[in-house]
């Protein structure tokens, strides 16, 4: 494989909490890494509960339903991120379990301190730590970009740059010289899903990111991504994520 990955760090934040840190039924569109500094936190998936041990780094893969809580307190740094071969093609296999590696308490403390300071040097350091962790968790047999995907790479890059609910398959196909029916069949063969499903996944990820890192109103987000109004955006998000934008924002104050 000769492709390089595209690493996008959504946010890296320090967190200190008590028993109010208690969330059920979380399922994210991004990956999350925890560097645990102190406390008695736990995570539960369908495979059972796991202690979040100080001095370790944990990967919670996108699409993994889980619960989070602590007995008395938790002190950690968390990083939400995407890592892709190209938009929509994840470079970390979605896992049915939480993965963990030793990091050391000193390393966890340095990462926590850097996340608090947020200088350019600190942000660069955090990105480097994240890249190191991603490399450690990445599978050896990661598939590359198939020949069937190659013709669509400019298209998905354009979708990423101009992401909108108003994008239409017919318009994209015509702009790149495809018959719409042939385009749909070839796209599905290459990616294992239809164009609309792929588009909705990218759009859901982007809206979720806006909800996490900005204070924009739903109306502002709706206007920015081609929805008629906040009601239609909320309905779309609830259909694709299973929860409302307001609840999603509240769940991720962690």
Predicted features along the sequence, with ranges:
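Short, Lys/Arg-enriched, disordered terminal segments
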Residues: 1-6, 250-254
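Short hydrophobic/aromatic patches on the structural cores and recognition surfaces of FHA
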Residues: 39, 55-56, 183, 207, ...
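Residues that scaffold the ATP/ADP-binding catalytic core of kinase and kinase-like folds
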Residues: 44, 87-90, 186, 198, ...
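N-terminal regulatory/effector-sensing and dimerization cores
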Residues: 4-97
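Flexible, active-site-proximal loop/turn residues at the rims of small-molecule/cofactor binding pockets
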Residues: 64, 139, 254
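Generic structural signal for secondary-structure transition and capping sites
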Residues: 17, 41, 120, 142, ...
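An amphipathic alpha-helical interaction segment
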Residues: 77-84, 100-164, 170-171, 175-184
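Terminal helix-turn-helix DNA-binding modules in bacterial transcription factors
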Residues: 157, 161, 166, 170, ...
């Amino acid at each position: 494989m000769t492709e390089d990955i595209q690493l996008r760090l959504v946010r890296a934040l320090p967190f200190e909490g008590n028993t109010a840190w208690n969330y059920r039924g979380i399922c994210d569109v991004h990956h999350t890494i925890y560097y645990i500094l102190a406390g008695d936190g736990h995570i539960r998936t369908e495979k059972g509960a796991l202690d979040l041990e100080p001095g370790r780094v944990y990967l919670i893969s996108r699409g993994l339903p889980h619960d989070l809580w602590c007995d008395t307190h938790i002190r950690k740094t968390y990083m939400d991120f995407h890592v892709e071969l190209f938009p929509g093609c994840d470079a970390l296999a979605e896992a049915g379990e939480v993965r963990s590696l030793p990091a050391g308490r000193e390393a966890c403390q340095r990462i926590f301190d850097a996340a608090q300071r947020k200088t350019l040097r600190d942000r660069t350091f955090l990105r480097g730590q994240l890249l190191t962790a991603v490399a450690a968790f990445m599978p050896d047999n990661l598939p590359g970009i198939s020949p069937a995907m190659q013709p669509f790479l400019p298209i998905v890059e354009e979708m990423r740059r101009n992401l909108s609910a108003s994008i239409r398959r017919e318009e994209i196909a015509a702009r790149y010289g495809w018959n719409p029916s042939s385009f749909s069949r070839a796209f599905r063969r290459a990616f294992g899903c239809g164009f609309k499903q792929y588009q909705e996944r990218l759009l859901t990820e982007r809206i979720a990111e806006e909800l996490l890192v900005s204070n924009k109103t739903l109306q502002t987000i709706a206007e920015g991504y081609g929805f008629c109004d906040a009601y239609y955006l909320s309905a779309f998000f609830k259909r694709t994520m299973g929860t409302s934008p307001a609840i999603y924002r509240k769940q991720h104050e962690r």
